Regions:
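Bacterial N-terminal signal peptides
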Residues: 7-16
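Short amphipathic alpha-helical "recognition" segments used for binding
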Residues: 6-7, 60
Length: 222
């Protein structure tokens, strides 16, 4: 009997060890960020820096986009015809009708943080933190920069902040900017926000997913 109990104890211990060694489950849409620094300058320090070019970048201002990164996983992302964009937009739920815009990410609302004013066309967005949405209506997408706060966790009773695009209304829009659509010669499986064609005073904010790239130019203001 003692041998049976001892064997059972050993098996229980080994099972617990095996469970402890299993990696944690990965989220369906991992978190990610895109970052860029503008309006700074490269200087030569007294001692060479451990950077490309051995210089130091000083007085730069940060711009960052934080977002959930869904994977395509073989799906038709945007559809066609009358159904274009419907699959990407969140579905409705009791008390939460389907949003008219796309969260352009996954889970928590996509967030833009900027330490410097940004000009999109004729609109200047002050430094601060914003939510990003996209109106997928063709012939071009529209980037929406909104002052709607974001919920860290879904709270249906919190009407002062959004989870994804649920509850979005346009009254807090700070800017609406046309996005140029391009077809990529390859497929991007994981949704990616990026800063492209960058110069010291600005460039383009771009979103890539599948074979679609949507982008819009911006300028950083001193």
């Amino acid at each position: 009997m003692k041998r049976v109990l001892a064997a059972a104890a050993v098996m229980t211990t080994l099972g617990a060890i095996a469970l402890a060694q299993q990696p944690p489950a990965r989220p369906m849409s991992p978190e990610g960020s895109a970052q860029v620094q503008v309006l700074g300058k490269w200087t030569k320090p007294a001692r060479p820096a451990f950077t490309l070019g051995r210089e130091t970048y000083t007085d730069g201002k940060w711009i960052e986009i934080k977002y959930g990164r869904p994977l395509q996983r073989g799906r038709d992302l945007f559809g066609s015809g009358a159904d274009y964009g419907k699959a990407a937009n969140d579905v409705g739920a009791p008390g939460f009708p389907a949003p008219p815009v796309w969260r352009a990410g996954a889970n928590k609302s996509t967030r833009l943080m900027t330490e410097v004013p940004l000009t999109f066309g004729k609109t200047t967005v002050p430094p601060g933190e914003y939510s990003l949405f996209i109106d997928l209506k063709l012939p071009e997408w529209t980037l929406i920069i909104s002052s709607w706060p974001a919920q860290d966790k879904f709270d249906p009773n919190n009407k002062g902040a959004l989870w994804g695009a649920y509850g979005y209304t346009p009254d807090k829009d700070v800017a609406r900017v046309a996005m140029k659509l391009d077809k990529l010669p390859y497929e991007v499986d994981q949704l990616t926000w990026a800063f492209v064609d960058m110069k010291n005073t600005g460039g383009r904010i771009a979103l890539m997913w599948g074979t679609t790239m949507a982008s819009t130019p911006f300028t950083a203001v001193k």
